[in-house]
Amino acid sequence: MTERLFKLQEHGTTVRTELIAGLTTFLTMAYIIFVNPSILGDAGMPKDAVFVATCLIAALGSAIMGLYANYPIAMAPGMGLNAYFAYAVVLHMGFTWQAALGAVFISGCLFLVVTLFGLRGLIIQGIPQSLRSAITVGIGLFLGLIALKSAGIVVGDKATLVTLGDLHSAPVILAVLGFIAIVALDKARVPGAILIGIVGVTIASFFFGGNEFHGLFSAPPSIAPTFLQLDIHTALTKGFLNVVLVFFLVELFDATGTLMGVAKRAGLLVPGKMERLNKSLLADSSAIFAGSLLGTSSTTAYVESAAGVQAGGRTGMTALTVAVLFLACLFVAPLAGVVPAYATAPALFFVACLMLRELAELDWNDSTEAVPAAVTALMMPFTYSIANGLAFGFITYAAAKLFTGRVREAHPMVWIIAGVFLFKFFYIGGH
């Protein structure tokens, strides 16, 4: 049956190799079951229900990817958009988390439509590489600021906006040690470096951080507080235009780039045999709106899947293994509930650091490419909004090409997106 489902021999792999690859991928991304409830919990969402939703959508998305597309790529709620969901849309802009889930649902529907009609590649090709790289860098800076704030390393200040926190406090010390441990373990190529760092700091918090242990295993909590709680009506109002656009664009670049990058590394992008890639695009589109129904922010393909590919994973059995392991995580809810913010902060900061390597992709000799990219990246943390970063980036890019006589270098898609953001600023208002 496994041979018929996954065509193991055709891909030069075995059941044992696929299971090991699945375990490897799971260990590298399991941190999300702690980080996602922590972030969305800050937006007022019930952490226990978010924990269940995270495990379920990671299992469902990965299973669809494995069984339908036969790809060794796992899925889970994405880093970056969960932070935008909680800290920008809910806490900064003042919308309810139910309305934010509605925006995720609408963006997921748009995502599914453009995938079904084959428009996904067309849109991707229309966005300049410099802005695509800048979006990743900007989200990295945004995550970095959130991580430093969560750890207490950076605190607010009336005179200078931000300043250094109390470096003698236990949370700060534990967060710094956790970050160093993650970097060292990652350098040593230890599977699950981020997960080990989170668990290590959490254990230390019981002794030095005043945390309390409430057990390790229990029956899964109820998902009822977040299940089908999305507010689509509010998400369709004019004030949500840029929120939906941000979710859609970031999902588009992040998921597509990850799918193609990991598939290429696995040797699965064979000219003339792109049916599996198309199925994988459809699978990850479906997972986005499914996640919003369960009660979590946008779901995406995980670049950590490359670790499983490196371990020999070539088929959907790898993704299915990840799905089963995420289902098993439903029974460790008590552990997830006691993970403090300063334990997940090192993981956030490490992911942020990795995202900054996209800076190397920029052509710094062409100011019409480099400057809009820099504006995109810098505006995200300094306005505390991924949407504003995208808006100023696209508008600056279009203006730079227009006033240097290089209009033809800008794809029509750039002008359309820049126009949408200009309309939003002048007729709907900023924020």
Name each model-derived stretch.
Residues 2-36, 57, 78-136, 264-359:
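Helix-loop-helix junctions within the multi-pass membrane cores of secondary transporters/permeases
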Residues 93-207, 320-431:
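Membrane-embedded alpha-helical modules
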Residues 23-30, 60-63, 67, 148, ...:
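Hydrophobic/aromatic residues within the transmembrane alpha-helices of Major Facilitator Superfamily
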Residues 1-49, 162-164, 195-278, 422-423:
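Helix-loop-helix hairpins and the membrane-proximal interhelical loops
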Residues 38, 63, 67, 88, ...:
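Membrane-interface helix caps of multi-pass small-molecule transporters
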Residues 58-79, 110:
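Juxtamembrane transmembrane-helix boundary signature
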Residues 19, 39, 123, 192, ...:
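Residue-level signature of catalytic and energy-coupling elements of molecular machines
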Residues 44-60:
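Loop-to-helix transition at the N-terminal end of transmembrane alpha-helices
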